[in-house]
């Protein structure tokens, strides 16, 4: 079925062209679905014999053997029916004591830091309204009115 057979010689070709484009894939689908698979070489012509060779594919090689089990580095333990030895309670006690001691040290350091922070003198207001920290060295020098950069003779 060719396009020139469908196109009329004297009229518009669009309807027939659209019909051809719509039906051509369907025609190919019908031909593929009605085809029969080849079952033997007796139905094959000489031109096809060279292409298909009608031989069964060679068998697949056997799968490789499974790997051997891993070797144990130590001698295998004898199968015993006795209960496993109970863990000593000392190891658990040592861990608990270590955690408690570490917690006490942490809390002691925290209390010391908080005590020093509370004991520190609060900020005082300077004459011009800015906040100045009172440290022991700076407060004694600032009230004397001595210039820090002045040389002592």
Swiss-Prot record:
Biased composition (Pro residues): 59-71
Gene Ontology MF: a single term: protein-membrane adaptor activity
Signal peptide: 1-35
GO terms under biological process: establishment of localization in cell
Keywords attached to this entry: Cell junction, Cell membrane, Disulfide bond, Glycoprotein, Membrane, Neurotransmitter degradation, Signal, Synapse, Transmembrane, Transmembrane helix
Segments passing through the bilayer: 93-113
Outcome of mutating residue 131 to A: No effect on ACHE tetramer recruitment to membrane rafts
Entry note about domains: The proline-rich attachment domain (PRAD) binds the AChE catalytic subunits.
Name of this chain's protein: Proline-rich membrane anchor 1
Organism: Mus musculus (Mouse)
Source organism phylogeny: Eukaryota, Metazoa, Chordata, Craniata, Vertebrata
């Amino acid at each position: 079925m060719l396009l020139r057979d469908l196109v009329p010689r004297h009229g518009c070709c669009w309807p027939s062209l659209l019909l051809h484009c719509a039906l051509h894939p369907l025609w190919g689908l019908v031909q593929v679905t009605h085809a029969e698979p080849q079952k033997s070489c007796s139905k094959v012509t000489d031109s096809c014999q060279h292409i298909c060779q009608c031989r069964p594919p060679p068998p697949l090689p056997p799968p490789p053997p499974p790997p051997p089990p891993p070797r144990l580095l130590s001698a295998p333990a004898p199968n015993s029916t006795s209960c496993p030895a109970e863990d000593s309670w000392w190891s658990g006690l040592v861990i608990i004591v270590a955690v408690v001691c570490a917690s006490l040290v942490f809390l002691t350091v925290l209390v010391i830091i908080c005590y020093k922070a509370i004991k520190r003198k609060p900020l005082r207001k300077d004459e011009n309204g800015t906040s100045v920290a009172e440290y022991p060295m700076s407060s004694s020098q600032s009230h004397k009115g001595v210039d820090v950069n002045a040389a002592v003779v």
